Amino acid sequence: MVIVGGPGSPLDLVGNAKVHRLLEAFYAQGKILGALCYAVGAFVWARKKEDGKSIINGKAIVAHPKEWDFTDDLPYPLYNATPANPGTDLVTPGFAFPLQVIVEDAVGDTGRVIAVPTANRKNPVAHFDFPFVSAQSVESSIAFGDKLVEVLSQK
């Protein structure tokens, strides 16, 4: 299961109970789980049945670094809006949550967060810690895809 992020993912995916149930089911089956950018937040809220901890507890997970968070207003326009589907006027004061901070809490004392503020296309950040493939943001999207191919080729 692969989830891609972006600024809308905190609203649509991260807090979505259906997404959490899918992640929990795939995790219980030992399936590979991938998330890019803010979609990594969905891992935080998916829980292990045996102890109620996040499925990423004790893991090394890549997260969008807090240095990249911003507090300027972030609109969520609907592209190609029509009179029948006009969209919303939703605006949040920056990102909905600080991803690095919530991932740090979820991985706990035995895990670690990989958040590299200097990441770019030439120095992307993607990591695998079974069963999780995670990557930082759009600059790491190619590395994320490459890491998924590498991991799935070994299964």
Region locations from a protein language model:
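Active-site-adjacent pocket-lining segments in enzyme domains
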Residues: 2-34, 39-155
